[in-house]
């Protein structure tokens, strides 16, 4: 008997199994190929806009993705660096081979984790409660909790031109039996599609005509636990399609599975295939392609922006029309893949299914796209499954606490009919959810769960103390416009003042940086760089942050008003049939969650609030 069984060894499965095992749960990870644990099936990169936030949040609570990325990274960049700190995002190119080897070895070393190379065929479910798993090897494993992290494997179907192949990924069998079995459980399910780009032999690329894109001169680590971070960095390159490329693609629309009706699943809106881009943006004469090394050896390059399911010979023809690729040799062709997913409104915020007790889902099975979104869900599913075994309160991150909270709340409350990816625009309180304050927001959770060490948490507490001390000093200390103070400001390269101001307003100036902060007062001289950066950020955005915190307090009042788990919405007089139907379907855990459901009116929320408060008084 296991405590937790995790089905699938992708990014969600890695985090789910690691979290459960590290929380002391006897855990089994079932995966089709042990060599492919943690494989980056698509692009060789981790992070990006909003996705970097997810990785930093994972790391803040003790997840693995940030550390693995730092070890396997071959280029590091901060995206949107010229914009505000709320929308900046960390991104790393990774050595794909090294990444999965590190991920696999980290799991194999965990004391409470067993890994078995076999495929789950059927779940053992009794009275709407999962009891275990039966595999393709006829093995039966019983468990208190099961977590599905199946990625694109559920009835996976690969498309290249007119050709179709049942597979979960190239070279790996689709999970047909499990996919068919899930259809019998009465769950709302759908079909989604994603795709991948061709890979090209480096010897066949003329890099001399391509634009170079280097990593940052002073790269920043993803993990706050990474020490002596000094990675070897490789350049990426930028190429461009042209009218000839577009003409080749247009002439073969009739062979594109996307347009022939061969593909039924809905594809990702924000990561379209090249044929979809040419069709949707027919007025554009060129599209950027990002040429990314797959490993530190740089023998193969991933052609980011060139996702396609056109026939093999067409892929070669259209790629060779791009400058620098006239002699390109494709080592691995692009393809589209369709797969089953469970509509995420079937889930609770813990990622447990509402209809099947003790069965959790994480990653692409929930309708998301992206390694980072998958990892975040896997981590939370592993944590909540473990907490449930211990009969402890679940960890449900609020929208004002973490992008992970936004991600899960969006999925569970709003659902999705297309592959969901994270954006900073999805977060109402993104100024509070900066990448670099993730450890301050979430570190205590990781420590309380036993996923962060005493040393790690002490480091976080020191930064929190420095931030509080530094900010209080800036807000309380006033500068008068005398000769001495103005001379000091001029020595820093800052404009003089003409009226009394507190130091926070001076530090909030766009020109004020960390080096100037150090000279402002001896209190800052001994503080570490991380603390100084956060003091600077909090000071610069102080009034905006204060406004967002006030908004959060209003939201908390609604979030704290809990709706009982088996609440009968029909018993509330004054609610329309439509509202009752939606509330019964979504089963919101709080009034705030109910407010996020489309079609739930303010009047209905008022009625519901009054009724629940009255019931609580009676109780």
Swiss-Prot record:
Q: Which PROSITE patterns match?
A: GIDA_1 (PS01280), GIDA_2 (PS01281)
Its keywords, alphabetically, are: Cytoplasm, FAD, Flavoprotein, NAD, tRNA processing
Q: Pfam families, per this entry? A: GIDA (PF01134), GIDA_C_1st (PF21680), SAM_GIDA_C (PF13932)
GO biological-process terms attached to the record: tRNA methylation; tRNA wobble uridine modification
Q: How does it assemble?
A: Homodimer. Heterotetramer of two MnmE and two MnmG subunits.
- Please give the family membership noted in the entry: Belongs to the MnmG family.
Q: What is this protein called?
A: tRNA uridine 5-carboxymethylaminomethyl modification enzyme MnmG
- What species is this protein from? Campylobacter jejuni subsp. jejuni serotype O:2 (strain ATCC 700819 / NCTC 11168)
User: What's the source species' lineage?
Assistant: Bacteria, Pseudomonadati, Campylobacterota, Epsilonproteobacteria, Campylobacterales
């Amino acid at each position: 008997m296991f405590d937790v069984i995790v089905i699938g060894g992708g990014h969600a499965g890695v985090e789910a199994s690691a979290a459960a095992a590290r929380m002391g749960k006897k855990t089994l990870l079932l995966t089709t190929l042990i060599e492919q644990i943690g494989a980056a099936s698509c692009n060789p990169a981790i992070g990006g806009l909003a996705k970097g936030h997810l990785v930093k949040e994972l790391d803040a609570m003790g997840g693995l993705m940030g550390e693995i990325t730092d070890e396997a990274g071959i280029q590091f960049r901060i995206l949107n660096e010229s914009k505000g700190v709320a929308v900046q995002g960390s991104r790393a190119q990774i050595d794909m081979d090294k990444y999965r080897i590190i991920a696999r070895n980290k799991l194999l070393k965990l004391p409470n984790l067993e890994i078995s190379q076999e495929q789950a065929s059927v779940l053992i479910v009794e009275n709407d409660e999962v009891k275990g798993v039966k595999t393709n090897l006829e093995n039966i494993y019983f468990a208190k909790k099961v977590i599905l992290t199946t990625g694109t494997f559920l009835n996976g179907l690969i498309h290249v031109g007119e050709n179709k192949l049942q597979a979960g990924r190239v070279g790996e069998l689709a999970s047909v039996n499990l996919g068919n079995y899930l259809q019998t459980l009465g769950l709302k399910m759908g079909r989604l599609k994603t795709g991948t780009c061709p890979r090209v032999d480096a010897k066949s690329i003329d890099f001399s005509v391509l634009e170079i894109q280097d990593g940052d001169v002073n790269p920043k680590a993803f993990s706050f636990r990474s020490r002596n971070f000094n990675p070897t960095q490789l350049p990426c390159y930028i190429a461009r399609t042209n009218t000839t490329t577009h003409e080749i693609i247009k002439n073969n629309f009739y062979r594109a599975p996307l347009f022939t009706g061969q593909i039924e699943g809905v594809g990702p809106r924000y990561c379209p295939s090249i044929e979809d881009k040419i069709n949707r943006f027919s007025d554009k004469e060129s599209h950027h392609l990002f040429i990314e090394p797959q490993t530190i050896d740089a023998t193969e390059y991933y052609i980011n922006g060139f996702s396609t399911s056109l026939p093999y010979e067409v892929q070669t023809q259209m790629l060779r029309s791009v400058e620098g690729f006239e002699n390109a040799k494709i080592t691995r062709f692009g393809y589209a893949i369709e797969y089953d997913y469970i509509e995420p409104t079937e889930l609770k915020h813990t990622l447990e299914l509402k209809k099947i007790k003790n069965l959790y889902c994480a990653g692409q099975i929930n309708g998301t796209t992206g390694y980072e979104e998958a990892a975040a869900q896997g981590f939370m599913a592993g944590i909540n499954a473990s907490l449930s075994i211990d009969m402890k309160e679940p960890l449900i991150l609020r929208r004002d606490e973490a992008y992970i909270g936004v991600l899960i709340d969006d999925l569970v409350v709003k659902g999705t009919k297309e592959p969901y990816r994270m954006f900073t625009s999805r977060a109402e309180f993104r100024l509070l959810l900066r990448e670099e304050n993730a450890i301050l927001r979430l570190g205590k959770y990781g420590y309380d769960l036993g996923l962060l060490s005493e040393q790690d948490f002490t480091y976080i507490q020191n930064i929190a103390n420095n931030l509080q001390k530094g900010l209080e000093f800036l807000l309380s200390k006033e500068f008068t416009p005398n000769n001495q103070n103005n001379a000091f400001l001029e020595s820093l390269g800052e404009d003089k003042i003409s009226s009394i101001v507190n130091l926070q307003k001076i530090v909030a100036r766009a020109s004020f940086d960390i080096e100037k902060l150090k000279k402002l007062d001896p209190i800052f001289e001994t503080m570490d760089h991380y603390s100084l950066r956060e003091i600077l950020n909090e000071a610069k955005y102080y009034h905006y942050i204060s406004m967002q915190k006030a908004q959060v307090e209003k939201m908390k009042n609604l979030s704290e008003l809990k709706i009982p788990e088996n609440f009968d919405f029909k018993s509330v007089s004054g609610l329309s049939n439509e509202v009752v139907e939606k509330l019964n379907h979504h089963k919101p855990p709080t009034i705030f969650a109910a407010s996020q459901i489309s079609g739930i009116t303010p009047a209905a929320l008022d009625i519901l609030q009054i009724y629940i408060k009255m019931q609580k008084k009676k109780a």
